[in-house]
From Swiss-Prot:
This is Sulfite reductase [NADPH] flavoprotein alpha-component. Pathway: Sulfur metabolism; hydrogen sulfide biosynthesis; hydrogen sulfide from sulfite (NADPH route): step 1/1. It comes from Yersinia pestis (strain Pestoides F). Residues 64-202 form the Flavodoxin-like domain. Binds 1 FAD per subunit. Binds 1 FMN per subunit. The gene is cysJ. Belongs to the NADPH-dependent sulphite reductase flavoprotein subunit CysJ family. Residues 247-461 form the FAD-binding FR-type domain. The lineage of its organism: Bacteria, Pseudomonadati, Pseudomonadota, Gammaproteobacteria, Enterobacterales.
Amino acid sequence: MTTQAPPTSLLPLSPEQLARLQAAVGEFSPTQMAWLSGYFWGMVNQQPGAVASPAVAAPPPVTVTLISASQTGNARRLAEQLRDDLLAAQLSVNLVNAGDYKFKQIAQERLLVVVASTQGEGEPAEEAVALHKFLFSKKAPKLSETAFAVFGLGDTSYEHFCQAGKDFDSKLAELGAQRLLDRVDADVEYQVQAQQWRQQVVATLQAKVPAQSTAPTQFIAPTQSTTPAAAAITSGGTTTVSPYSKTAPLTAQLSVQQKVTGRNSEKDVRHIEIDLGDSGLRYQPGDALGVWFDNDPALVEELLALLWLKGDEPVSIDGQNMPLAQALLSHLELTQNTTLIVDKYAALSRDETLIALLADKPALQLYAKNTPFVDMVRQAPSDLNADQLVGLLRPLTPRLYSIASSQAETENEVHITVGVVRYDIDGRARSGGASGYLADRLEVDGDIRVFIEHNDNFRLPANPETPVIMIGPGTGIAPFRAFMQQREVDGASGKNWLFFGNPHFTEDFLYQVEWQRYVKEGVLTRIDLAWSRDQAHKIYVQDKLREQGAELWNWIQQGAHIYVCGDANRMAKDVEQVLLDVVALHGAMDAEQADEYLSELRQARRYQRDVY
């Protein structure tokens, strides 16, 4: 929630004094600000006739700076929990979103705690990219006066597990900082590890820093990331707390499920509309919809048959007893495999092929990525019992989809654009867990459990006159549909430019009629389209960006905000390289200057990405 300053007429300061004060405090770190607050309090409350002296002022409280580097909200929620723990222990804490952290002040930090998630192939969370770049640059200062701890969040199904956390931990140590605790690398099911780590952090800091005798000062960066992200949304200057979250989702109803790619398309993309009813669930353009799903019953039956299990065997999931079949249907992950699961299953099955695979890490990673658990069991039969099976599998996790609508237009509905995952293994048709559920198994008017994952790192500019550049091939177009709905309702006068790409114009132009209407009515100023397979030479959105480099630079010079949504591993990296090339060429900069310029755009929230 943003707190507005009172009118200057109500302040005990003249406009000139207020201006000087604001200019002065901008130079101080949170620790220095805390000391000054105590110093000024002492000046006001001193005995008559006494002379204020900095030498006798109370020692400044040592502030713990807690940086949240979150991609899907988990790191942010963990950081908020740790903040509350530290406040309860009467320690001064400053919780800040990595994207808002003024990293040039890092040399002044004495106690630093980082909660960092990893995205894609070992990349830091989008909001932490600038901080990551700074620490790995020549400008990073020595941190010999800093003590730190790092908690890494990741997913063992990816090769570079918790790489961002590892990067922050190793670089901080390399710069001279001292570890308070060993780094923790946590998998998808991180809650138990996180709770233990929080207790260790509090105990360690309590031993290192005396508790404050009065309520600790807490400096919070002006960002919604410090509120419970899954349950709060700011609108019109007020914050509305929602009862719905990842752990307490809303049961909504599917109202529309429509294929939006052509009959001959190689892609199966669905437009999904979900009725929120009178739930009061609110979201903003840029947010994501979390979707809980059930596995395919046919997949459950196939797995049970392969293991000679009936499905009625009693098992326990998070302390709740249920039949094995129910656990497999609604509580355990069946469509994603990991190297750790392959390792454990190889030991249980004693399959020679799997055991040999363990010695070849690249081959193991590829196998786990491309072979669902049920197909591994089929290829390497075993006689697991129900408890062994449950012990192998990971808990089911919801999938996040970029929201493709604005409530300013759709009111009590939320729309998403879903690329259905379909593939064959040994002649057997397979589909993605959530995408197959939405496309094939969930019926219209059927119940669906959803929640909003707020993303304050992907927001339209506050000024409606600001130009907007949107780069979203494939299903990456989803949030830009929401952006355009919002800009149209707001009557925003700023220019809008869309870059979109897909294989074929006739089969894969998602929401074609809507974009044509926006162009005709002047809401969409420009649209550049890249059809990769409509000609012999493949053309992608990054090629269109390079082609329009001069005009792109002109828009950037006019203050345009740049947004990128879609594939993190290839498209987003290629687009960023083209942006760097455009900045260097048309801005007359060398590669290092262009990289710094793009980092400055990112810091100013003029370059935002929602990549996955």
